[in-house]
Amino acid sequence: MEQAPEDQGPQREPYNEWTLELLEELKNEAVRHFPRIWLHSLGQYIYETYGDTWAGVEAIIRILQQLLFIHFRIGCRHSRIGITRQRRARNGASRS
């Protein structure tokens, strides 16, 4: 019978260390795109809801990822990612 190979894969960081690094990167990016008061309020909400737990860390990561994704998708003026809004010609000549 075949056996699973022993731990031959790349060494992985502990989950909590990786999670905290991800949160720090998301916070740094969010500060560039959203008002600090919004982010502070979000942090307060998460703390009041989850306390100082890993569930709170995971929740704020998920929310920040969603906010940033939508922000970029709608069209952030700091980024080339997003929907480009085409301006219509006033005389309607752009369509035939």
UniProtKB/Swiss-Prot annotation:
Entry's Gene Ontology BP terms: DNA-templated transcription; monoatomic ion transmembrane transport; protein homooligomerization; regulation of DNA-templated transcription; symbiont entry into host cell; symbiont-mediated activation of host apoptosis; symbiont-mediated arrest of host cell cycle during G2/M transition; viral penetration into host nucleus
PTM field: Phosphorylated on several residues by host. These phosphorylations regulate VPR activity for the nuclear import of the HIV-1 pre-integration complex.
InterPro entries tied to this protein: RetroV_VpR/X
Keyword tags: Activator, AIDS, Apoptosis, Cell cycle, Host G2/M cell cycle arrest by virus, Host nucleus, Host-virus interaction, Ion channel, Ion transport, Modulation of host cell cycle by virus, Phosphoprotein, Transcription, Transcription regulation, Transport, Viral penetration into host nucleus, Virion, Virus entry into host cell
Region (Homooligomerization): 1-42
Positions bearing Phosphoserine: 79, 94, 96
GO annotation, cellular component aspect: host cell; host cell nucleus; host extracellular space; virion component
Record localization: Virion; Host nucleus; Host extracellular space
Pfam families: VPR
Taxonomic superkingdom: Viruses
Ranges that cross the membrane: none
Summary of subunit composition and partner proteins: Homooligomer, may form homodimer. Interacts with p6-gag region of the Pr55 Gag precursor protein through a (Leu-X-X)4 motif near the C-terminus of the P6gag protein. Interacts with host UNG. May interact with host RAD23A/HHR23A. Interacts with host VPRBP/DCAF1, leading to hijack the CUL4A-RBX1-DDB1-DCAF1/VPRBP complex, mediating ubiquitination of host proteins such as TERT and ZGPAT and arrest of the cell cycle in G2 phase.
Entry function: During virus replication, may deplete host UNG protein, and incude G2-M cell cycle arrest. Acts by targeting specific host proteins for degradation by the 26S proteasome, through association with the cellular CUL4A-DDB1 E3 ligase complex by direct interaction with host VPRPB/DCAF-1. Cell cycle arrest reportedly occurs within hours of infection and is not blocked by antiviral agents, suggesting that it is initiated by the VPR carried into the virion. Additionally, VPR induces apoptosis in a cell cycle dependent manner suggesting that these two effects are mechanistically linked.
The family this protein is said to belong to: Belongs to the HIV-1 VPR protein family.
More details: HIV-1 lineages are divided in three main groups, M (for Major), O (for Outlier), and N (for New, or Non-M, Non-O). The vast majority of strains found worldwide belong to the group M. Group O seems to be endemic to and largely confined to Cameroon and neighboring countries in West Central Africa, where these viruses represent a small minority of HIV-1 strains. The group N is represented by a limited number of isolates from Cameroonian persons. The group M is further subdivided in 9 clades or subtypes (A to D, F to H, J and K).
Protein name: Protein Vpr
Organism per entry: Human immunodeficiency virus type 1 group M subtype B (isolate JRCSF)
